[in-house]
């Protein structure tokens, strides 16, 4: 799975791609071609 800063253009790669929001992150999942999986949203800042 790739991590990108913007998934605007990646959501239209295939007609089977879906946008899913889980735990504050946005995912693009594709069941027909799993290579197209993408996640947006980086690591959260940890407190010391």
Swiss-Prot record:
Pfam families: Ribosomal_L36. It is found in: Plastid, Chloroplast. Keywords: Chloroplast, Plastid, Ribonucleoprotein, Ribosomal protein. The keyword Ribosomal protein applies. GO terms for molecular function: structural constituent of ribosome. GO terms for biological process: translation. Coiled coil: none annotated. This is Large ribosomal subunit protein bL36c. It comes from Guillardia theta (Cryptophyte). The gene is rpl36.
